[in-house]
């Protein structure tokens, strides 16, 4: 029996910290990747947004130094994409917001051509923070991902938040001992692997036809 081809996993770390600094977000993402490795062969890579050049804009290439085209290639090649962000003042980090804004170019590609680099890919979410906001950030990212065409499985997120008023220097030790976060990481890994395998075995097919939602899309042919 032939061996199973590894699942390609891309973790997008939107921590504001630069390499080689440790981040709670990066370490929780690594825990999820380790849980996935225990379930299936994977080929995993981590892209740290803070060390990339991703200028403001909605185009495919905003400058000669723009790293976005290379990142799009990584996203296209991935079976699973992990969106990993810390919480800043109750919301996702500015780097996660920048990523979402740049992804809009791929969403517009689908609207205008009927082809998508992201539709049907399995996505998961990793969130860390010092006090609160995890569920709010999770919900807002889930809304964006599902409308862009990512497939969100059950238990699609893992998070950890620290205790109100306590020194952030204690966050890492507390997170590493938090059984609930470990349980969420395991559940997230199981869901991602299961649904990525399912979609590889049964790829999503688009029904051929023309969109009728508006004049702009009147001649849009969906791929067969």
Residue ranges of predicted features:
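N-terminal beta1-alpha1-beta2 submodule of the flavodoxin-like/Rossmannoid cofactor-binding fold
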Residues: 1-113, 175, 179-224
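Glycine-rich beta-alpha junction loops
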Residues: 16, 130, 159-162, 210
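A short beta-to-alpha transition loop/helix N-cap that caps and shapes the active-site region
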Residues: 19-20, 132-133, 163-167
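Surface-exposed beta-strand edges and their flanking turn/coil or helix-capping segments
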Residues: 24, 59-60, 138, 152-153, ...
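Short, glycine-/small-residue-rich phosphate/pyrophosphate-handling segment
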Residues: 114-160
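Conserved anion/nucleotide-ligand pocket segment
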Residues: 148-156, 160-161, 167-180
């Amino acid at each position: 029996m032939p061996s199973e081809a590894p699942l390609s996993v891309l973790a997008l770390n939107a921590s504001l910290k630069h390499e080689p600094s440790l981040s709670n977000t990066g370490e929780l993402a690594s825990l999820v990747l380790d849980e996935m490795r225990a379930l299936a062969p994977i080929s995993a890579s981590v892209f740290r947004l803070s060390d990339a050049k991703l200028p403001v804009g909605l185009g495919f290439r905003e400058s000669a130094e723009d790293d976005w085209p290379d990142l799009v290639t990584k996203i296209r090649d991935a079976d699973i994409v992990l969106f990993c962000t810390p919480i800043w003042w109750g919301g996702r980090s500015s780097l996660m917001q920048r990523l979402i804004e740049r992804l809009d170019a791929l969403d517009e590609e689908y609207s205008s051509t009927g082809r998508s680099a992201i539709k049907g890919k399995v996505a998961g979410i990793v969130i860390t923070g010092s006090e609160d906001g995890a569920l709010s950030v999770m919900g807002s990212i889930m809304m964006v991902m599902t409308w862009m065409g990512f497939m969100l499985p059950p238990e699609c997120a893992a998070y950890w938040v620290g205790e109100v008023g306590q020194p952030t220097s204690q966050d890492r030790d507390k997170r590493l001992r938090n059984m609930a976060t470990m349980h969420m990481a395991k559940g997230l890994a199981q869901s991602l692997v299961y649904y990525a395998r399912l979609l590889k075995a049964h790829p999503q097919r688009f029904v051929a036809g023309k969109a009728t939602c508006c004049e702009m899309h009147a001649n849009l042919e969906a791929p067969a």
